[in-house]
């Protein structure tokens, strides 16, 4: 993942997205294949690689010369995967409520988790693991009905024919040696073919496209090649403009992104891969509130975990996923297969809407009890239910004037004893598809 997140990344993100991949790929042409992704809402990201051995930054630590390249690569000798249980991973992902998972097949360091024939720099040939780490995981995912995603770094700082290496030096310029670059593209496409043929992913999650242009990568050619294997393959937005959806990283947009499909990828602590010293864990409440906010704004959350070099998942991450799963089991009706919510200003919190627009879900963050307010609702409310319970709530209309078209304020009484430990969800059944008033008040 990218580490050079700058203070103004939100503005950069919004600016880039306004002119990036969505301008090259027609949303109408991919509407059907994107439906499962739009309904899925939650994915689990897994960063697993040799960087977990010393607990250092994945790839960037040698690129930025925090550690020498030889010392970085020596970590491969400690990567055992001795306690790797792909079925247990898949079961945990299922328990979380996630509908898809993305595993790092190869990060920027070039170390492949599968026995690629294009390079000996893989876990099968060069590490004590001596096994294909992808096959059992994707088999386990598919057995549980979870969509399979493959993270793949376009750039490869270890491959001798790739120009980039350290942050202040490069091997060559593409313009000076186009044949060498051509050899790298052959290598790149060979590995992509292996992944598509052997693991048949549902989603390709690219990274590392920023070092070269779309023409240099032959991004349109890569897209065409991948879709020849699977026309329904979903491709993320890090293919220099030739992806299907956008991928903001770590920073949550303040306003709703103006894109058909988007996915926030975020860590459970401060780092993507396993780092023993990083104990700054997000709480289950923080994760759930971020998740709800993403869904309310029409997006997905791709939540990251970083297994240890032996394949065990840190206890803190297991707890986060299980708590998230408990909440999803109770409140999933308001999340999965629903649409992003109503415009800001009508309700001070996240919302979602059913696909037929006759049900509105309100998310009460924190310990919100007493009266909550909904503004501008022109519909009649047939029933208000606390999701996951059989409790029905009373409400009243305040300020409705008979001669004015402006609807009154809806006040809902929420007793403390119905509150969820994390986020309470109210289900409002409406008399017809939702209609909101956005005009002026008064005369």
Which positions does each model-derived feature cover?
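Bacterial Sec-dependent N-terminal signal peptides
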Residues: 1-23
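Mature catalytic domains of secreted/periplasmic carbohydrate-active enzymes
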Residues: 22-443
